[in-house]
A protein has these predicted regions:
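Gly/Pro-rich turn-and-neighbor structural signature
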Residues: 2, 14, 31-32, 36, ...
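Short, conserved catalytic/metal-binding motifs centered on acidic residues
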Residues: 35, 72, 101-103, 118-120, ...
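Acidic/histidine-rich catalytic cores and adjacent linkers
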Residues: 176-177, 181-186, 221-383
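Short helix/loop capping segments that flank catalytic or ligand/cofactor-binding pockets
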Residues: 44-46, 80-83, 124-126, 148-150, ...
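Beta-sheet entry/capping signal
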Residues: 34-35, 41, 69, 112-115, ...
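Short, flexible loop/hinge motifs at secondary-structure junctions
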Residues: 1-89, 116-117, 147-149
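Structured secondary-structure scaffolds
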Residues: 87, 92-103
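Conserved beta-strand -> loop -> alpha-helix junction used to position metal-binding or nucleic-acid-contacting
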Residues: 114, 183, 192-226
Length: 383
């Protein structure tokens, strides 16, 4: 009844998980040696029991979690280990069940030969420490619609406890092709191996000049932004055209502008103080010039990495609804859900309807046909 407040409505009764599935019990005992409120002795009070469905090496099993409760004999305070995090609040699906879907998205994203990469920091709680740490969420995007591709776009997120280059190097260990990203030094070992080609982000370089122009506009920054603006005007003209046509147009129209921009910037650097902000922005441009110009000779590449930056907007939205991740494992769970939700959004699929349908059928779906459940492959029945 819509008139009945949610808090007063009876909760639906969930059917128990099939008894024939193998089960594993995990007993979580409170770690407190004494009452945290008054220091009194703790005595057993009972336990809360829950079950969650998990996929272990392509076979389902039920994880029965017993969370022991203890009560203080002096002040009646109750202590108990918090319930383990789940991908879906109050859901029975464990993270491993949905992880196969996220893995399938990852395989798809990495299979094309071009990927957009970026990262954004998130706050993560550290048990026993007074303040949270920062752990990045990495985003990997496959989206070639600007080059006329009809292949579905997709996004894969990965969490890491720090921003060391070893993490994206691991993520991209089996990848070969174009890597469009900013000039993060952690990617350099990948470029040195030879099977990954660096493609730069003109928007990143332009932003450095634009920020200076906003604070201290000058004829030099005005001219630099005008020249870069001409490059973006060409991109607007050819957006959605086939890669071969984009390459031809860029060679004919963009390449001469890039050649002129390089000569002009190098000349300006001879007249600017090395400590000047404009000189620093121009040096960034020249230091990464080869990667920034690569797109002009390849119709599949983009002028910038805005595709990845746009995919990170969902994280910015999330920050308005939560303050931090509760743990590193919580970061992994968030990356999994962002992968599925982000890929739904890129393909015009309503995320809540998709997840509701997938969770209803995934337990009975053949694991070797998991790709059938990807957002762009699945037909969601009308409700």
């Amino acid at each position: 009844d819509p008139a009945v407040p949610p808090a007063l409505r009876p909760s639906p009764v969930r059917r128990p998980l099939p008894p024939e599935l193998p089960r594993e019990e995990r007993c979580l005992e409170p770690q407190e040696p004494a009452c945290p409120a008054c220091g009194g002795d703790l005595k057993p009070l009972g336990e809360d029991v829950s079950e969650q469905l998990e996929l272990i090496k392509s076979a389902f099993k039920v994880i029965k979690i017993r969370r022991k409760k203890k009560a203080c004999a002096r002040c009646d305070v109750i202590v108990q280990v918090p319930a383990p995090s789940r991908p879906i609040e109050r859901g029975i699906a464990g993270p491993g069940l949905l992880a196969r879907l996220a893995d399938a998205v990852c395989d798809y994203v990495m299979s094309m030969g071009k990927v957009h990469v970026d990262d954004t920091p998130v706050d993560v709680l550290q048990p026993g420490k007074g303040k949270p740490k920062t752990g990045p969420l990495w985003v990997y995007v496959r989206d070639d619609r600007n080059a006329g591709s009809t292949q579905p776009p997709a996004v894969w997120f990965a969490y890491s406890p720090d921003r060391k280059g070893a993490h994206p190097q691991t993520h991209l260990a089996g990848f070969s092709g174009l890597l469009q990203a900013d000039a993060y030094a952690g990617f350099n070992p990948l470029y040195e191996e030879g099977h990954i080609r660096e493609v730069g982000c003109m928007a990143h370089a332009r932003r450095k000049i634009h920020d200076i122009h906003v604070r201290h506009p000058s004829p030099t920054t005005t001219e630099a932004l005008r020249r870069i603006g001409e490059l973006y005007a060409i991109e607007a003209d050819i957006r959605g055209r086939p890669a071969e046509e984009r390459q031809q147009v860029r060679e004919a129209r963009s390449r001469p502008i890039l050649v002129g921009l390089e000569s002009w910037v190098r000349e300006k650097l001879t007249t600017l103080s090395r400590q000047a902000d404009t000189a620093k922005a121009f040096n960034y441009l020249m230091n990464h010039w080869r990667a920034l110009c690569y797109y002009a000779g390849d119709g599949w590449a983009e002028i910038d990495n805005n595709i990845a930056e746009n995919a990170l907007r969902v994280i910015s939205l999330g920050r308005k609804n939560y303050l931090f991740f509760g743990s590193d494992s919580g970061g992994d769970r968030a990356a999994l859900m962002y992968t599925l939700i982000g890929s739904c959004k890129l393909n015009g699929v309503e995320p809540e309807a998709y997840l509701r349908h997938v969770l209803a059928i995934i337990a009975d779906h053949p694991i070797n046909k998991i790709k059938e459940l990807l957002p762009w492959n699945l037909t969601i029945p009308a409700e």
